[in-house]
């Protein structure tokens, strides 16, 4: 299937195998009129010059099938503490070489991010030196200050604020403030519409704790990349946000092209 046949723009201008996308969904989402199966993901990665994409879906076994089939695709375990056996499933999948952390969506799954039921999972992530990407930007469960409670309780955990507050300036500023107070908190850019806030985050929080994410297929990847490019950052810092920071966080080294062996 050609790029045109699956609805991708005809040109992008991005070098091949360069970007690292910290936030991608796979699956069918009829409510949003979008979908991303394995073949489409493979073509999307190639088309946009994405060297590696972190993908997830509430059905973790489906994600496993996708990442095993698609070069450049890596899984984040969807962790829902309301589901019996969620911890055991997470531990099993985190042993898989293509799973590099967890995704938490307290808004969708209706739990506080610092619920004690989550704590054993975070302890496991700390032991493995793996991050948690947490949806951030909506009441009642995903405000940045609620997620901060988890980051404070586990200062050795690597906590990524997905969407860095999303579309509300109060929550965006709050996310930057939370990251400023907590050196274990990272900011991820997808779905956050204010391009200048990306540069502000880099300036205030530091150049190594802001990550590019697209939220594909819900957001168009080229638009999300362009936000970073026009944010006011220098070219070196644009490169750091678009790829190097995620390589460091997920792969273990900012110059690595795949995860460093876990021993």
Task: List PLM regions with ranges.
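Active-site environment of divalent metal-dependent phosphoester hydrolases
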Residues: 27-29, 60-62, 82-85, 109, ...
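Histidine-centered divalent metal-coordination motifs
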Residues: 23-27, 105, 135, 163
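Active-site gating/metal-coordination segments in enzymes
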Residues: 52, 60-136, 181, 185
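Divalent metal-dependent hydrolysis catalytic cores, especially in the metallo-beta-lactamase
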Residues: 22-25, 32, 36-61, 72-80, ...
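Mid-to-C-terminal alpha-helical segments outside catalytic/metal-binding sites
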Residues: 1-22, 31-52, 207-209, 222-263
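A general structural detector for well-ordered alpha-helical segments in enzyme core domains, enriched
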Residues: 40-44, 62-66, 89-93, 117-121, ...
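Conserved, mostly hydrophobic/aromatic
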Residues: 23, 45, 63, 93, ...
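Catalytic pocket-lining loop regions of alpha/beta-barrel enzymes
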Residues: 114-212, 261
């Amino acid at each position: 299937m050609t790029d045109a046949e699956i609805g991708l723009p005809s040109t992008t201008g991005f070098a091949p195998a360069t970007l690292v996308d910290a936030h991608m969904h796979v699956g069918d989402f009829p409510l949003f009129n979008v979908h991303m199966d394995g073949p489409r993901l493979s073509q999307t990665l190639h088309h946009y010059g994405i060297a590696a994409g972190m993908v997830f879906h509430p059905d973790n076994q489906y994600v496993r099938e996708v990442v095993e089939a698609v070069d450049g695709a890596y899984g984040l375990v969807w962790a829902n503490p309301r589901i019996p056996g969620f911890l055991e499933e997470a531990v099993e999948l985190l042993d898989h070489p293509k799973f590099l952390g967890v995704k938490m969506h307290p808004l969708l799954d209706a739990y506080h991010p610092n619920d004690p039921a989550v704590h054993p999972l975070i302890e496991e992530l700390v032991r493995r030196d793996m991050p948690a990407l947490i949806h951030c930007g909506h009441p009642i469960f995903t405000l940045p200050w609620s997620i901060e409670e988890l980051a404070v309780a586990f200062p050795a955990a690597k906590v990524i604020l997905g969407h860095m507050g999303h579309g509300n300036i109060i929550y965006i500023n709050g996310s930057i403030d939370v990251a400023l107070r907590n050196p274990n908190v990272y900011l991820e850019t997808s779905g956050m519409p204010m391009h200048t806030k990306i540069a502000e985050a880099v300036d205030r929080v530091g150049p190594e704790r802001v990550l590019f994410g697209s939220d594909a297929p819900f957001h168009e990847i080229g638009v999300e990349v362009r936000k970073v490019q026009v944010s006011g950052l220098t070219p070196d810092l644009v490169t750091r946000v678009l790829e190097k920071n995620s390589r460091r966080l997920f792969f273990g080294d900012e110059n690595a092209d795949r995860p460093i062996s876990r021993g």
